Amino acid sequence: LDEEKLLKTISRIQKDIWIGINNYLSPLEQMNVVNQTLFSHYQFLGLNNDDDELRYMYINNAVDALKGNHFAIGILYLCLCQQLDLPVYGVCLSAHFILARAKDYITDFDNKEENREEVLFYVNPYNKGLAFSEKEINIYLNKIGAQPSDKYFAPASNRQVLFEYVQYLI
């Protein structure tokens, strides 16, 4: 792991996003700037399950190769947004990692029902930052036979996200 190289690359991507973001953009427009930078300018790709090799589960390899699985791409996206002070949080959706764009910053992650109401829309970083709503989450949960629960809709703390990521890796 070349930590210095990784941090320089992430910093460069962050600066490229920062150049395009201003306070006059709507939350959706801000996410579009992130998407354009990551997926058009840098050409990051989400790998399908067949290509989901172990090395692409790690953020450093995903950054080097410009491709990764849903967690690696999602955590990179999350880190970039949070470094830019955008209220974006991880959501651990039954075997998928998505992001939530909130109205404002969340400090108490224990009240999942209240935090769920703070979500403006969801982002699928694995699918080029596609924005979607609770409706699509409900369709997905129905498809896999899972019961809807606030935990599948509410933003999670970074600690919770890292816990899920480690569980995914082992």
Question: What role is predicted for each listed range?
Answer:
Residues 1-169:
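A structural boundary/capping signal
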